[in-house]
Regions:
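Active-site-proximal structural scaffolding
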Residues: 14, 60, 64, 78, ...
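Acyl-donor binding region in acyl/amide transferases
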Residues: 1-75
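A short helix-loop-beta-strand connector motif used in the catalytic cores of GNAT acetyltransferases and
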Residues: 155-167
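Acyltransferase donor/substrate-recognition loop-hinge adjacent to the catalytic core
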Residues: 61-141, 178
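Secondary-structure transition/capping motifs at alpha-helix termini
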Residues: 25-28, 160, 170-177
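Conserved GNAT-fold acetyl-CoA-binding loop/helix
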Residues: 137-154
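Conserved beta-strand in the GNAT
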Residues: 1, 168, 175-181
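A structural signal for short, well-ordered beta-strand segments and their strand-loop junctions
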Residues: 31-38, 79-86, 168
C-alpha cells in the first residue's frame, strides 16, 4: 500500500515517487502495489477521478485531475469505483423513512439503542468495531481493525461526535446488527 500521495504536475516527479515505493516494496519481498490507501481500512483510500469542483468529505482525499492522468501513464488501473454523495434534506421525505422504519421494527423485532451521552455511545463501540470487521472482511484489501486501532479511534473520534448523530440497532436477542454515524 502507498498513501499520502502529493506531487506537482510533473510526470517525472510522480514516476520518481512511484519508483521509490516499488523499490521499498521489493526490499520487503512484496510483488504488487496498490494505492493511494492509508495504513488501515479506517484511513482515507482511493484517488479522486471525477467531481473536482466539489469539496471532499472528511474520509476522502482531494486530488487534482493530473494525479489520475499521471498514474494511468505509469500503468495503474482503476480497481474499484466509489461514489461519494450528498443528500439534501429539503428533498427527503421523513414520513416515508418513519413508515419504513416502523415496518422493519415490527417485522424483525429490532430496536434503536438509546445513546443520549458519549458514555452511553462508548458502551457500544466495541460491538460496533466487531460488526465493522465482520461486515467488511469479505472485501478485497480489507485490513481488520486491531484492538490497538480500536482504542485509538475511540479516543480520536467518539469524544467530538454528537451522540445524536450516532445510531445503533440491535436484534431481538440484543446483538448489535447495524450502526450509522
Amino acid at each position: 500500500r502507498f498513501g499520502w500521495l502529493d506531487m506537482i504536475d510533473d510526470l517525472n516527479v510522480t514516476k520518481a515517487l512511484i519508483e521509490k515505493v516499488a523499490e521499498k516494496g521489493r526490499e520487503h519481498q512484496l510483488d504488487y502495489m496498490e494505492g493511494p490507501m492509508g495504513f488501515s481500512s479506517m484511513d482515507k483510500v482511493g484517488l479522486l477521478t471525477d467531481g473536482y469542483d466539489h469539496i471532499a468529505n472528511m474520509m476522502t482525499w482531494y486530488h487534482y485531475p493530473y494525479y489520475k492522468e499521471h498514474l494511468a501513464k505509469l500503468g495503474f488501473e482503476k480497481e474499484k469505483g466509489f461514489i461519494d454523495m450528498s443528500f439534501l434534506l429539503e428533498n427527503s421525505k421523513p414520513e416515508l423513512f418513519k413508515k419504513t422504519a416502523e415496518a422493519i421494527r415490527k417485522r424483525y423485532g429490532v430496536r434503536l439503542i438509546d445513546t443520549p451521552t458519549t458514555q452511553e455511545v462508548l458502551k457500544h463501540v466495541d460491538a460496533m468495531f466487531d460488526l465493522y470487521n465482520e461486515t467488511y472482511s469479505r472485501l478485497a484489501s480489507y485490513v481488520p481493525i486491531s484492538n490497538a486501532q480500536r482504542d485509538y479511534f475511540k479516543k480520536k473520534y467518539i469524544p467530538f461526535i454528537n451522540p445524536e448523530y450516532i445510531r445503533f440497532i440491535e436484534d431481538k436477542e440484543g446483538k448489535l446488527i447495524s450502526f450509522a454515524i
